A protein has these predicted regions:
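Short alpha-helical scaffolding segments that buttress acidic/His motifs in well-ordered protein cores
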Residues: 89, 112-116, 179
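Non-catalytic peripheral regions of patatin-like phospholipases
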Residues: 2-70, 94, 103-107, 130, ...
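Active-site glycine-rich loop that binds ribose-phosphate moieties when present
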Residues: 68-77, 109, 113-124, 135-143
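Alpha-helical segment proximal to the catalytic Tyr-Lys
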Residues: 90, 98-102
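Secondary-structure boundary motif
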Residues: 77-80, 148
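Short, basic and Ser/Thr-rich N-terminal targeting/leader segments
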Residues: 83-85
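Short acidic-hydrophobic surface loop/beta-edge motif
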Residues: 122-127, 211
């Protein structure tokens, strides 16, 4: 029940932050977090054009991000750091082109901002002198930590982007939306194929399942909601 209340508070805070800016004092924020019905409004179109022609270092030189205040308000980072529930947050190391995972003890506002940093909307988030972007470019979500962590053999996957759409996109914005879905789904598809390959080898008796370095037989489950995610 506490989790439901916290999630409700998060979305209400995001709604308030977006609502304050709907008429233009932060068009990028509105375009990112406002509902789908705004996609055909002049505000949305101007925000899209701005993001395609200017970088966030130009249109947001002071690096303002309303999400920082939202996270500060909603998330109890001290409780998260001390929690027995293992958390893994993925980011993309810009200079190295590699994924970096942050665990409980390392989590902070900056880490969460980095994990959600779309580079055409926000400046890279620096942590310990290194710039980071959204982790979804390389791990969306990262599955491999769960293979080595103290977790059950059942893994439940909740996809955020639809894997399949029934129509061929023809409008420019719809094409870009579908391209982003494919790009962000690609790391997950690659990991799922690797998981399936390893599981096949285990079933064939070709991989060791004993000892600390043994492979585990995992059961993958997914809540598929492509029809809802496509709306």
């Amino acid at each position: 029940e506490g989790a439901r209340k916290a999630l409700d508070k998060l979305w209400r805070e995001i709604n308030l932050s977006g609502g304050r800016n709907i008429f233009g004092d932060s068009s990028i924020w509105s375009a990112t977090f406002s509902p789908a019905w705004m996609k055909d409004t002049p505000l949305w179109r101007s925000a899209e054009s701005l993001a395609m022609t200017m970088s966030p270092y130009q249109f947001n030189p002071f690096n303002l991000n309303p999400l920082r205040r939202v996270l500060d308000t909603v998330v109890d980072f001290e409780a998260v750091r001390q929690s027995d529930i293992q958390l893994f947050v993925a980011t993309t190391a810009v200079k190295k082109g590699r994924v970096r995972l942050f665990e409980n003890a390392e989590l902070s506002v900056d880490v969460l901002l980095a994990s959600a940093c779309l580079p055409h909307l926000f400046q890279a988030v620096e942590i310990e002198g290194e710039p980071y972007w959204d982790g979804g470019y390389l791990a969306n979500p990262p599955l491999w930590p769960l293979f080595y962590a103290s977790t059950p053999d059942d893994i439940l996957l909740l996809p955020l982007n639809p894997f399949q759409r029934d129509e061929t996109p023809r409008d420019a914005d719809v094409i870009m939306d579908r391209l982003n879905e494919i790009v962000f789904n690609a790391p997950l598809v690659a990991e799922l194929r690797a998981v399936a390959f390893v599981q096949d080898l285990i079933e064939a008796g070709r991989l060791n399942q004993t000892g600390d370095d043994g492979y585990r037989k995992l059961r993958m489950h997914a809540i598929e909601a492509d029809s809802h995610l496509s709306d």
